[in-house]
Swiss-Prot record:
GO molecular function: dUTP diphosphatase activity; magnesium ion binding
Full protein name: Deoxyuridine 5'-triphosphate nucleotidohydrolase
Top-level EC class: hydrolase
InterPro entries, per the entry: dUTPase (IPR008181), dUTPase-like (IPR029054), dUTPase-like_sf (IPR036157), dUTPase_trimeric (IPR033704)
Catalysed reaction equations from the record: dUTP + H2O = dUMP + diphosphate + H(+)
Organism whose genome encodes this protein: Bordetella avium (strain 197N)
Keywords of the record: Hydrolase, Magnesium, Metal-binding, Nucleotide metabolism
Length: 149
C-alpha cells in the first residue's frame, strides 16, 4: 500500500491529526483550521484553511477533496468546486472552497470536520487519432441508452 507524507503547517493541528474512522474508511476528515467561527450566509462561499500541506510526489497518485455527506444533506454545506483535485506535484496547504447552498446561515466552528481527503490512483493517457472505433455492444448510445426501454 502506498504511503503519502502529510505535513502539518499549523501547530494547532497536532491534536487533530486526520485518522481513518474505521478499517474500511476511504477518506480522512479535514478540519477547519480557523481561529474563530465563520458564518456562511446562504449562497456564500469562502476558502477555509485545513492547516495541512500535502505532497503526493508520485504521479501515479492524486488526492481528492470531497464533501462530508452529513454537512451537505443536513445543512447544504458543500464544496464550491464540488470536488477538489490535488495533483501529485502540488506542495501547498490544502484549502477547502466551502459553499452554503442551503437556505439558512451556517456557522463553521474552529477545528470542525469540513471535508474528506481521499488518495486515488491516476493513470495518465496518451491520445491516438483514429478513423473509427471497433464495434461494441453499446456503440455510441449515450444518456439513458442502457436504462429503461
Amino acid at each position: 500500500m502506498k504511503s503519502v507524507d502529510l505535513k502539518i503547517l499549523d501547530a494547532r493541528m497536532r491534536d487533530y491529526l486526520p485518522t481513518y474512522a474505521t478499517p474500511g474508511s476511504a477518506g480522512l476528515d479535514l478540519r477547519a483550521c480557523i481561529d474563530k467561527a465563520i458564518t456562511l450566509e446562504p449562497g456564500a462561499t469562502t476558502l477555509v484553511p485545513t492547516g495541512l500541506a500535502i505532497h503526493v510526489a508520485d504521479p501515479g497518485y492524486a488526492a481528492i477533496i470531497l464533501p462530508r455527506s452529513g454537512l451537505g444533506h443536513k445543512h447544504g454545506i458543500v464544496l464550491g468546486n464540488l470536488v477538489g483535485l490535488i495533483d501529485s506535484d502540488y506542495q501547498g496547504q490544502l484549502m477547502v472552497s466551502t459553499w452554503n447552498r442551503g437556505q439558512t446561515a451556517f456557522t463553521l466552528e474552529p477545528m470542525e470536520r469540513l471535508a474528506q481527503l481521499v488518495i486515488v490512483p491516476v493513470q495518465q493517457v496518451s491520445f491516438n487519432v483514429v478513423d473509427e472505433f471497433g464495434a461494441s455492444e453499446r456503440g455510441a448510445g449515450g444518456f439513458g441508452s442502457t436504462g429503461r426501454s
